[in-house]
């Protein structure tokens, strides 16, 4: 395939387009942008769809432009939200922008020979507006009827929460972003999630009104699981892309646990794997001799390498193999100390751990929520100390449980593990 739109359609990226002319447009190099709001100091797994969309365009020779919303982030996008977001101050937003930029730099190529990626902050062009000048120069270009007709606006206006004037103006800011990029950078296409359709068309309509020229929008489906829930969240919260917020091991583990019903779709949308290989895994999963989690392992390897790099993937695999319950891998304190930076760990006083019941330790480390749950897991053979199965409900922590007198690797089932650092007075 020589056209990026064909690839995106085959992989399930396209939810809607403002015009089918986009395919013809992409036969020549263009500039395409997507915006990222700085609501946190890291993007999460759900945002990876947008980054991959930009990355696919770049692979076909188009220039990806990432907008980090230093201005729009202060307003808060109402799209898909039931209530108004808490507004962030400028200092917090600047901190978040740095983290998000690192996420983008890990995946997009900023040294591409013909189409290097660009990161821009929309505060750079909004900060020079006064309220009066913005109303005069930008506000007059928008009409209330189409603004009120946007689904994101109608939903909020009909809710008990209502909608503030601040949020109502968000689509004006995003629409002006597109106009500014069109005029100053030659950007002609905007990417966004399906919940961004109204904001994207605000921009395409504005460009047509001001310049009588076409601009285009593409929306992709929001990343969801087969049960309809948003993908990118775990029991502990968002699956962050930044290693400072989530280790490569925990990131890898989240992907290994993906349900069979979701893995092929995630391969299509979150990896650069060839479609032939993806179809091979899809067929393999239907075979009677399929080894469970084979496809998930391939998925986890690809996405972890993409987000955390080759070294991050090596660490994730090493930790996974080293702390697997029942693993024959020899554990020593030095190895565990290194692993502790990439998996859940805690510190406890040695005197408070020795001679403690294992059931109590499971609860104190929050690997189990109650003693009754801990007992049940022990009876079912799901508790391990230093990779060795423990089935005695009355097991007491002794010096024999310690690695080099200072560490314990405790596991509750295959998913939940904890390295306990033992501190002497």
From Swiss-Prot:
Chain residues that bind ATP: 233
Per the database record, which ranges form the S4 RNA-binding domain? 356-422
Q: Which GO terms describe its cellular component?
A: cytosol
Superkingdom of origin organism: Bacteria
Query: Where in or outside the cell is it found?
Result: Cytoplasm
Reactions performed catalytically: tRNA(Tyr) + L-tyrosine + ATP = L-tyrosyl-tRNA(Tyr) + AMP + diphosphate + H(+)
List the ranges annotated as motif 'HIGH' region: 38-47
> Is the S-adenosyl-L-methionine keyword given for this protein?
no
What stretch of residues is annotated with the motif 'KMSKS' region? Answer: 230-234
Mind telling me what this protein is named?
Tyrosine--tRNA ligase
Q: Which gene encodes it?
A: tyrS
